[in-house]
């Protein structure tokens, strides 16, 4: 007889708690959606600015040229000074894989949502295939340079003993060290990835301006690419501060910039190429049609 009101009050309290939690979840989802929308809009506007993109090239050059001077003002025992640090192993050594995964998803969504054409989507994704070929070709070229300029040494307590072994393979097989001119492949790859990602992500501003579908998944993928681009900039700075010789880093960055210029700055503007980012995605304005 006395338990009825108690049970009813308990059920009422439970209902109110569930309703309160439901409202809280809705508010949190609304806030997350608003932040996602605002963040993607601002990042797209920033990366889509031609002036800021030119300044970005100057920023990368300054990082590589003047960044090594910071080694005299930073703690040499920090985690980023170790070759075995988490970021170096998990991200820098696999930078192209991370870039292809994140950027490939972004290009796939942007191109397909804008055109609904598989052939056009495949053409734009082929830029990543070209990038992979550039990365592989550059890596082999760097190894060839090291082979052609190197000599075989045996470490001794008194110093180094020079051996007349003909190539690096036989030198390493004998347990010795091969020392040649080593272009920084990490500096090359990070520079190339930074320029490539900035170029590809810049198209999102124009995509939004044309009112094309831009739901939460696409905006989230875009922001993940922006975060990865920021990480590459940070790790490039760490690389030039803590690792490699100065000229090795400068040459690596110069080759990465030259590779970007040959592809995005030159070849992709030709009709027989994969095309520049955004090519064929957006309807031409009436004024352009009248002008033509």
UniProtKB/Swiss-Prot annotation:
Q: Which InterPro entries match?
A: FIT, FIT1, FITM1/2
Q: Which domain of life is it from?
A: Eukaryota
Segments on the Cytoplasmic face:
40-54, 116-141, 209-220, 271-292
Q: Which residues does the Swiss-Prot or TrEMBL record annotate as the active site?
A: 186, 244
The record's tissue-specificity note reads:
Predominantly expressed in skeletal muscle and at lower levels in the heart (at protein level). In the heart, mRNA expression levels do not correlate well with protein levels, suggesting post-transcriptional regulation in this organ.
What job does the chain carry out? Plays an important role in the formation of lipid droplets (LDs) which are storage organelles at the center of lipid and energy homeostasis. Directly binds to diacylglycerol (DAGs) and triacylglycerol.
**What is the protein's given name?**
Fat storage-inducing transmembrane protein 1
- The source organism is Mus musculus (Mouse)
Q: What is the lineage of its organism?
A: Eukaryota, Metazoa, Chordata, Craniata, Vertebrata
């Amino acid at each position: 007889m006395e338990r009825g009101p108690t049970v009813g009050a308990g059920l009422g309290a439970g209902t109110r708690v569930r309703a309160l939690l439901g409202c809280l979840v809705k508010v949190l989802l609304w806030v997350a959606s608003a932040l996602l929308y605002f963040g993607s809009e601002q990042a797209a506007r920033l990366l889509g600015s031609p002036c800021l993109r030119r300044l970005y090239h100057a920023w990368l050059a300054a990082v590589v040229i003047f960044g090594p001077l910071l080694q005299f003002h930073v703690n040499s025992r920090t985690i980023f000074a170790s070759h075995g640090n988490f970021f170096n192993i998990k991200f820098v050594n696999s930078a192209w894989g991370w870039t292809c995964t994140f950027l490939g998803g972004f290009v796939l969504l942007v191109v397909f949502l804008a055109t609904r054409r598989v052939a056009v989507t495949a053409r734009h994704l082929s830029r990543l295939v070209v990038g992979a070929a550039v990365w592989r070709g550059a890596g082999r070229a760097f190894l060839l340079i090291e082979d052609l300029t190197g000599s075989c040494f045996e470490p001794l307590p008194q110093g180094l003993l020079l051996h007349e072994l003909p190539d690096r393979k036989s030198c390493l097989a004998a347990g010795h060290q091969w020392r040649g001119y080593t272009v920084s492949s990490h500096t090359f790859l990070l520079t190339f990835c930074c320029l490539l990602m900035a170029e590809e992500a810049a198209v999102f501003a124009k995509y939004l301006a044309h009112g094309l579908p831009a739901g939460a998944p696409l905006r989230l993928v875009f922001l993940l690419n922006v975060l990865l681009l920021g990480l590459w900039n940070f790790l490039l700075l760490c690389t030039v501060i803590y690792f490699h010789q100065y000229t090795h880093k400068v040459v690596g960055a110069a080759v990465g910039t030259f590779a970007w210029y040959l592809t995005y700055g030159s070849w992709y503007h030709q009709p027989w190429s994969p095309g520049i980012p955004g090519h064929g995605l957006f309807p031409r304005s009436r004024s352009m049609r009248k002008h033509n």
